[in-house]
């Protein structure tokens, strides 16, 4: 048995055929290139059609489609709210796939990237054998996939895991509103923006970030500057570590997980901070629970969402650990 898995990211679509053993074949990527609304939906359908053609040529029976998307998903209807894709306010993705690929007649399962990432780690990554695990995805934004007692948590409106809005610092300032307090300081976007602010404000600063036009400073540049001992990069990342540690403490105290897995584009370079994150969490968390949790980097930095989408489809849209 095999399924088609598709992972919609912020800049590209990845698709593949995934079998029951976790084998991945015919991985294909398409760049979004500024597409919006139905243009993105059409590109998804084209990617799926390409995989169906591959499956037919190689005589691989396809039983379902699993799709991983950013934002929030109504898992019952397949409607998607993806704020980074204009026109995807309540986008009927599952129905569009079924309508535009009527000849294939297989079920379509859609879930958010937070949940799909934790599915991938449970199946083939750092969470194998766990029943209580949290996947922290830190990239442009911050989100969490949460599995407790073998069940994925989705919430009343499928919005669980929008952790960028965790309230970690007082008093409230208006700048937190669009992305939340946690993302403001500790997402890739937040790290980049806080570094730009500090460079702009400190006229006496002559570190490595000053060598770049402020508008061109990226999160990657901040980590590179940190490695060179840059004071602004060190300050910005120290604040991010503090926030990551406080968030970890909150998750540990609320959910008592076995593992918290750190992934997304930032963890990458930020995986070196995992011991410091644990030390910060140790100050704040429930004292017994924090000593029982393990903080680890993802084992699937490039494929957790895609494998998770495959796992979702292979399990008929219901991931529940026995």
Segment roles from a protein language model:
Residues 248, 252-261:
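Proline-aspartate-enriched helix->loop->beta-strand connector
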Residues 16-18, 25-27, 34-37, 100-102, ...:
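Glycine/GP-enriched mid-protein hinge/lid loop-to-helix segment characteristic of carbohydrate kinases
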Residues 3-7, 62-66, 109, 133-137, ...:
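Short glycine-aspartate micro-motif
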Residues 32, 38-45, 57-65, 71-134, ...:
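Glycine-rich phosphate-binding loop and adjoining helix at the ATP-binding site
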Residues 18, 109-122, 268-322:
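Glycine-rich phosphate-binding/hydrolytic loop that grips phosphoryl groups
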Residues 65-71, 261-269, 298:
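Glycine-rich beta-strand-to-loop/alpha-helix junction loops that act as flexible
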Residues 1-4, 11, 18-25:
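N-terminal, positively charged, Ser/Thr/Ala/Gly-biased leader segments
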